[in-house]
Protein backbone atom coordinates (compact mmCIF):
# COMPACT_ATOMS: atom_id res chain seq x y z
CA UNK A 1 0.00 0.00 0.00
CA UNK A 2 1.25 3.49 -0.85
CA UNK A 3 1.66 6.22 1.71
CA UNK A 4 -0.52 9.33 1.67
CA UNK A 5 1.84 12.27 1.07
CA UNK A 6 0.54 15.35 2.88
CA UNK A 7 3.89 16.79 3.97
CA UNK A 8 6.71 17.37 1.52
CA UNK A 9 10.15 18.05 2.93
CA UNK A 10 12.95 18.52 0.43
CA UNK A 11 16.45 19.89 0.82
CA UNK A 12 15.57 22.69 -1.62
CA UNK A 13 14.71 26.35 -1.16
CA UNK A 14 10.90 26.72 -0.91
CA UNK A 15 9.38 29.07 -3.50
CA UNK A 16 5.70 28.80 -2.55
CA UNK A 17 3.23 26.53 -0.80
CA UNK A 18 -0.37 26.22 -1.85
CA UNK A 19 -3.24 24.22 -0.46
CA UNK A 20 -2.19 21.18 -2.48
CA UNK A 21 1.06 21.96 -4.35
CA UNK A 22 4.48 22.92 -3.01
CA UNK A 23 7.01 24.62 -5.28
CA UNK A 24 10.79 24.71 -4.82
CA UNK A 25 13.62 26.68 -6.44
CA UNK A 26 15.95 24.82 -8.79
CA UNK A 27 18.95 26.19 -10.69
CA UNK A 28 18.83 28.28 -13.88
CA UNK A 29 15.34 29.78 -13.63
CA UNK A 30 13.59 26.48 -12.99
CA UNK A 31 11.13 25.38 -10.32
CA UNK A 32 10.06 21.98 -9.03
CA UNK A 33 6.29 21.74 -8.54
CA UNK A 34 5.12 18.87 -6.32
CA UNK A 35 1.47 17.85 -6.00
CA UNK A 36 0.72 16.43 -2.55
CA UNK A 37 -2.19 14.24 -1.49
CA UNK A 38 -3.59 17.07 0.68
CA UNK A 39 -7.34 17.58 0.53
CA UNK A 40 -8.83 21.06 0.52
CA UNK A 41 -12.35 22.38 0.19
CA UNK A 42 -13.82 25.83 0.77
CA UNK A 43 -10.37 27.26 1.64
CA UNK A 44 -9.69 24.61 4.32
CA UNK A 45 -6.89 22.03 4.15
CA UNK A 46 -7.96 18.85 5.96
CA UNK A 47 -5.49 16.83 8.07
CA UNK A 48 -6.09 13.61 6.14
CA UNK A 49 -5.20 13.25 2.48
CA UNK A 50 -6.29 11.06 -0.41
CA UNK A 51 -3.84 8.40 -1.55
CA UNK A 52 -2.36 9.13 -5.02
CA UNK A 53 -4.25 12.42 -5.38
CA UNK A 54 -0.97 14.18 -6.23
CA UNK A 55 -0.26 11.74 -9.06
CA UNK A 56 -3.79 12.15 -10.42
CA UNK A 57 -3.55 15.97 -10.35
CA UNK A 58 -0.18 15.83 -12.10
CA UNK A 59 -1.52 13.50 -14.81
CA UNK A 60 -4.50 15.80 -15.36
CA UNK A 61 -2.15 18.76 -15.79
CA UNK A 62 0.00 16.79 -18.24
CA UNK A 63 -3.10 15.79 -20.23
CA UNK A 64 -4.12 19.43 -20.69
CA UNK A 65 -0.58 20.62 -21.44
CA UNK A 66 -0.43 18.00 -24.22
CA UNK A 67 -3.97 18.70 -25.45
CA UNK A 68 -3.30 22.45 -25.69
CA UNK A 69 0.17 22.12 -27.26
CA UNK A 70 0.37 24.40 -30.29
CA UNK A 71 -2.52 26.52 -28.98
CA UNK A 72 -1.00 27.97 -25.83
CA UNK A 73 2.52 27.71 -24.42
CA UNK A 74 3.12 26.18 -21.01
CA UNK A 75 5.97 26.03 -18.51
CA UNK A 76 6.60 22.26 -18.47
CA UNK A 77 10.20 21.06 -18.86
CA UNK A 78 10.18 17.51 -17.44
CA UNK A 79 8.34 15.06 -15.21
CA UNK A 80 11.47 13.16 -14.17
CA UNK A 81 12.40 13.21 -10.48
CA UNK A 82 15.62 15.26 -10.27
CA UNK A 83 18.72 13.37 -9.13
CA UNK A 84 19.11 13.08 -5.38
CA UNK A 85 15.44 13.60 -4.54
CA UNK A 86 13.16 10.96 -2.94
CA UNK A 87 11.37 8.37 -5.07
CA UNK A 88 7.95 9.28 -3.62
CA UNK A 89 8.04 12.29 -5.97
CA UNK A 90 7.61 9.94 -8.95
CA UNK A 91 4.45 10.87 -10.84
CA UNK A 92 3.72 13.89 -8.66
CA UNK A 93 6.44 16.38 -9.67
CA UNK A 94 7.16 18.59 -12.66
CA UNK A 95 10.22 20.67 -13.43
CA UNK A 96 8.96 23.90 -14.95
CA UNK A 97 10.26 27.21 -16.26
CA UNK A 98 9.97 30.06 -13.78
CA UNK A 99 7.47 32.37 -15.49
CA UNK A 100 5.06 35.14 -14.59
CA UNK A 101 1.68 33.47 -14.16
CA UNK A 102 -1.76 34.86 -14.84
CA UNK A 103 -3.64 33.79 -11.68
CA UNK A 104 -6.96 32.63 -13.12
CA UNK A 105 -9.09 29.78 -11.85
CA UNK A 106 -11.20 28.14 -14.56
CA UNK A 107 -14.36 26.43 -13.31
CA UNK A 108 -16.87 24.55 -15.45
CA UNK A 109 -20.08 24.03 -13.51
CA UNK A 110 -22.47 21.23 -14.36
CA UNK A 111 -24.51 21.38 -11.17
CA UNK A 112 -25.98 24.10 -8.99
CA UNK A 113 -23.83 23.94 -5.86
CA UNK A 114 -21.51 25.83 -3.52
CA UNK A 115 -20.96 29.52 -4.24
CA UNK A 116 -22.95 29.13 -7.47
CA UNK A 117 -26.04 28.15 -5.47
CA UNK A 118 -25.60 31.16 -3.21
CA UNK A 119 -25.27 33.50 -6.22
CA UNK A 120 -28.30 31.94 -7.91
CA UNK A 121 -30.47 32.36 -4.80
CA UNK A 122 -29.63 36.09 -4.71
CA UNK A 123 -29.64 36.95 -8.42
CA UNK A 124 -31.00 34.07 -10.50
CA UNK A 125 -27.59 33.89 -12.15
CA UNK A 126 -24.09 32.52 -11.63
CA UNK A 127 -21.27 34.90 -12.57
CA UNK A 128 -23.71 36.96 -14.60
CA UNK A 129 -25.00 33.94 -16.54
CA UNK A 130 -28.81 34.01 -16.25
CA UNK A 131 -30.30 30.61 -15.43
CA UNK A 132 -33.88 29.27 -15.50
CA UNK A 133 -36.06 29.98 -12.47
CA UNK A 134 -36.88 27.18 -10.06
CA UNK A 135 -33.54 25.39 -9.92
CA UNK A 136 -32.77 23.76 -6.58
CA UNK A 137 -29.53 23.16 -4.70
CA UNK A 138 -27.54 20.39 -6.46
CA UNK A 139 -29.77 20.55 -9.58
CA UNK A 140 -28.13 19.58 -12.84
CA UNK A 141 -27.73 22.69 -14.98
CA UNK A 142 -29.37 22.71 -18.44
CA UNK A 143 -25.84 22.84 -19.88
CA UNK A 144 -22.40 23.32 -18.30
CA UNK A 145 -21.32 26.93 -17.76
CA UNK A 146 -17.79 28.38 -17.70
CA UNK A 147 -17.16 30.68 -14.71
CA UNK A 148 -13.54 31.93 -14.61
CA UNK A 149 -12.30 33.96 -11.65
CA UNK A 150 -9.15 35.36 -10.16
CA UNK A 151 -7.25 32.77 -8.13
CA UNK A 152 -7.47 34.17 -4.61
CA UNK A 153 -4.86 33.64 -1.93
CA UNK A 154 -6.04 31.78 1.16
CA UNK A 155 -8.58 33.82 3.08
CA UNK A 156 -9.21 36.30 0.25
CA UNK A 157 -12.31 36.43 -1.94
CA UNK A 158 -12.02 35.57 -5.60
CA UNK A 159 -13.35 37.93 -8.24
CA UNK A 160 -15.45 36.55 -11.10
CA UNK A 161 -14.16 37.63 -14.48
Regions found by a protein language model. Name each.
Residues 2-152:
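Active-site loop/lid in soluble adenylation, ligation, and acyl-transfer enzymes
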